[in-house]
Amino acid sequence: MAADLKSPRRIATEEAFSIPEVAAGLRGVARAPGNSLDLILVKRIYDAPKDDHPQMAALLPGLLDLEEKRLPDMDKNGVAMQLLSLTAPGVQMFDADTATELATLANDRLAEVISRHPTRFAGLAAFAPQSPKRAVKEMERAIKTLKLNGFIVNSHTNNDYFDNPKFFPILEAAEALDGCI
């Protein structure tokens, strides 16, 4: 049963998803040496022993499901639409090449599910800030070709934030594309 659209529509605006390739990559990140505070979250979501963190172990299947259980759950809870974005930490913990590839793949999958359910889902595109030039190209593709609604960046990228001038081309592209970040 679809949400009652005669009443005010309930739109969930911070709905995370992932794809198997990102999950596998983050599992690898979780198992690599490092001291980033982000590793705590990554380990709990992507590499937690089920016995140690049963709630976190149950989280990943929900992130990977974009239709089978998500749509009935939306109906059950009266949610007419979800604004989907790649879950934290996005592609920020990968090298530039891997991040670019995974962001492109995630955006393609997101656009596919939106095309199947355009009244139920909208989406924010991921991009790889590690390579601002390639990020701008993916941002343009996401808005112009995939018809996504804006962009998601999950926190910092290699301990750099968007006030660093190297990221200004990304901010300029978002403005030119009239896309929110």
Give the label of every model feature segment.
Residues 1-181:
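Helix-coil boundary/capping segments in enzymes
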